[in-house]
């Protein structure tokens, strides 16, 4: 036990000597973290043996010593990898390779030259948040190759442009805007620059109305028209009166997908031109279904009911599949873009999927995301009024149901 205490004291002495020396080479920082690694390994071993002290040094709990030891191992290996890169010969101080800085956003990146970015919510300097950005960020890609990039700022948040040319956001101002802002607007101040909402207003999605397909019960699915645009196509809707028998894209037209209208006469209190089901959830007016035109293919988002439809009627109903857009790009750019669209006041789509990828796809832009629409017209309007992420591609498609 005395030898263990002696080794522990020697390591602590070496650590203190390094701190006082203020050496700024990466080799010296690697030696420092090697000593930290050994120190935590000894403390963890002593704690497992039931000891609470090593000499006069109290020992933390077993969980703490295990965490500190693993963290020291990770940083030690990271610095050894950095030493083999072109940036290993740069000046590196002890604070720049500290665990606290590495765990600061963006995590697992080395950082140099921090500066403040002040965000004034509602353009009020007394209602502000201060964020930290960095002149330079060092990170490893999936192939363990080191890259040096600049920390950048725009109206949305703090980011860096990775080696593929994509923006990787590590701080989004909208997160705090939901808590502190009344208007949802803010002004960004950093160094000698100011970014306000008026500067980026030209890139905002213009407001436009769109039709929505309601999701009623399975007995009487109907089309409805929005009284007001909802954030993501789930706003309050009202029934509209049938005005024609053209395609379901016509405003106010109601299309029947339930059982065929009975040939019997109207019941009490009903007119020959209108028949309402009292027991259906939707309570909508029913119309005979017509054959879909080429422009109507792709407007449905629910599975067609099997009962009460002839073979021809079922084929006609199934022809209207929900139209889709398949986005292809990097995971980070698609996630940031989806976050902005879901928090936008005018989404203009029906549903948006999470970011996913095909198993075994190792290409650079392997991530995928699906966007569903209620009609091809809504899809065309979405493409017209929205900008997709940089280097992102898209293609059209449709599904039998969602």
From Swiss-Prot:
Pfam families: PPV_E2_C, PPV_E2_N. Its main location: host cell. Residues 321-402 are annotated as: DNA-binding domain. One of its GO terms (cellular component) is host cell nucleus. Phosphorylated. It is found in: Host nucleus. Residues 216-230 have a biased composition (Polar residues). Keywords: Activator, DNA replication, DNA-binding, Early protein, Host nucleus, Isopeptide bond, Phosphoprotein, Repressor, Transcription, Transcription regulation, Ubl conjugation. One of its GO terms (biological process) is viral DNA genome replication. Residues 1-202 are annotated as: Transactivation domain. Residues 254-263 have a biased composition (Basic residues). Belongs to the papillomaviridae E2 protein family. Plays a role in the initiation of viral DNA replication. A dimer of E2 interacts with a dimer of E1 in order to improve specificity of E1 DNA binding activity. Once the complex recognizes and binds DNA at specific sites, the E2 dimer is removed from DNA. E2 also regulates viral transcription through binding to the E2RE response element (5'-ACCNNNNNNGGT-3') present in multiple copies in the regulatory regions of the viral genome. Activates or represses transcription depending on E2RE's position with regards to proximal promoter elements including the TATA-box. This is Regulatory protein E2.
